[in-house]
Amino acid sequence: MKCYFVRHGKTQWNLEGRFQGANGDSPLLKESIHDLEKLGDYLQDISFDAVFSSDLKRAKDTCQIIMSRNQHPQTITFEPALREWHLGKLEGNKIATISAIYPHQMQAFRHNLAKFNNSIFEAESVYQTTKRVSSFVKFLKDKPYQNVLLVGHGANFTASIRTLLGYEPAVLRAKGGLDNGSVTSLETEDFEH
């Protein structure tokens, strides 16, 4: 099975440098829509056996734009398990402001999730958010799918993809994150390797 993970397009809050999380949401930027159409063109010949998207509007809109360009129509299933990391009190706040107040926590959030203290912000733990996504992906194991499209979010997908690859929490985001509108593919036969 080949899984195509797509991060939603760039939003107003991405532009403003705000945390969105699982409860904050903002619309896609107009210029992002054009980029997503190009991504849809790039993926247009892939026949997806299943298409799943986070149920948050920015991801739903991204998925619908991509699939509107696909040569093989497929029903989109909106899946709460693919929601962004619940970031609690961080949601809606400017990243620069939080970084000034909690420099060590933001350094940990960006580069060493093992040191991120989610309870300060009433947020999901790294384990909770990655377990949610990796469990959903592993649920697909017994399905007769060859190609699966999953549309979701940057912080969650970055950590979850690397969890699926066997990385420890300390290095899940050590090399940065996923760009808006990017696609990352993982292929597996047994969901163990």
Predicted regions and their residues:
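Extreme N-terminal starter segment of soluble prokaryotic enzymes
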Residues: 1-4
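GST superfamily/GST-like fold recognition
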Residues: 154-158
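Active-site glycine-centered loops adjacent to acidic/histidine catalytic or metal-binding residues
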Residues: 8, 81, 153
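Active-site-proximal alpha-helix that buttresses catalytic centers in soluble enzyme cores
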Residues: 7-71
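Domain-level recognition of soluble alpha/beta enzyme cores
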Residues: 167-193
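Short glycine-rich phosphate-binding loop at a beta-alpha junction
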Residues: 48-55, 77, 147-151
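Glycine-rich phosphate-binding loop signature in dinucleotide/nucleotide-binding domains
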Residues: 45-47, 140-146
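Phosphate-handling substructures
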Residues: 13, 69-132
